[in-house]
Amino acid sequence: MKTVLCLLPVEQRHKEKLERAAGAECSFIYAGEHGATGENVAAANIILGTPALKLINASEKLELLQLNSAGAEQYVRPGVLAPKTKLTNSTGAYSKAVAEHGAAMLFMMQKKLYLYRDAQKRHEWADFGTVTSITDATVLVVGLGDIGRHFAGIVKALGAHVIGVKRRPGEKPDCVDELYTMEMLDEVLPRADVVFSVLPGTPAATHLYTAERFDLMKPDAIFINCGRGAAVENSVLY
C-alpha cells in the first residue's frame, strides 16, 4: 500500500478522480495547501503539491514528488530529495490562465482602467487622456514556452504584430510574425510597444532586464513580467 499525501486544494470530485485513478493500491491523506507536517511528509510515498523543503529532509520513503507549480528550482538542489525520488512539475498546466492574466493586465494599462476604477470609487467623472490599442501594436514576447505562445496567439488574433524571442533557433510558430534568439534581444527591444516576458528561473535569465535594457525600450513601452521575478533587476524599477 502506497501513501499519497495531497497538499492541493481539492474538492470531493477531485478526490474521487484521484482515488479512481490510483486504485486500491494507494491510501490518501488530504492535508490541504498548508497542511504539510514533518509527520505526514515522512509517511508519504507520493506527494502532490509543494511541501516546504525542510519537511522533506531527503526522505528515503518518498518515491515521487509531483509539484503543482512549473518552477522546480528549489527542489533540485543537492540534499533536498533522495537520489531515488522522482520529481515532476506542472509545466503547461497554467499557460491559459497566466497568458489571459497577462492580456488582462495589458488591456488594463492600455486603457488606463486602473485610473478609471479609482476615479469611480471616488465618485469622480475623470478624463485621463489618450489610450492605446493592441491593434497594430508591436508586441515582443520574450520566452516562447506554453505561456508565451498562448499570449502571443491572443494578441496576434487582436491585430498585434508579434515578435518572439527564444533561447534556441527553431521553426517560427504561427502565433508570431518574427522570431529571434536571445542574442538578438537588444536589437528588438527598441521596436516594442509592449514587452511580455515569461522566462524561467535559470541563471541565464537572472537579472536579464537591467537598467541598460530598460533604457533600450520606448519611453512609453508597457513591460509585463509573467515569468520569474528574478529576471528583473528590481533596483532599476525605483
Language-model features: locations:
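A short, aliphatic-rich alpha-helical micro-motif
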Residues: 40-41, 56-59, 134, 187-190, ...
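Short beta->alpha connector loops at strand-helix junctions that form conserved
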Residues: 68, 86-92, 183, 227
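Conserved beta-strand positions in the Rossmann-like core of class I SAM-dependent methyltransferases
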Residues: 163
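Phosphate-binding beta-alpha-beta segment of Rossmann-like dinucleotide-binding domains, i.e.
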Residues: 83-138
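An N-terminal-biased, well-structured beta-alpha scaffold segment characteristic
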Residues: 1-86, 210
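Glycine-rich Rossmann-fold phosphate-binding loop(s) that bind the pyrophosphate
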Residues: 144-145
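N-terminal Rossmann-fold NAD(P) dinucleotide-binding loop
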Residues: 148-149
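Rossmann-like adenosine-cofactor binding region
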Residues: 169-238
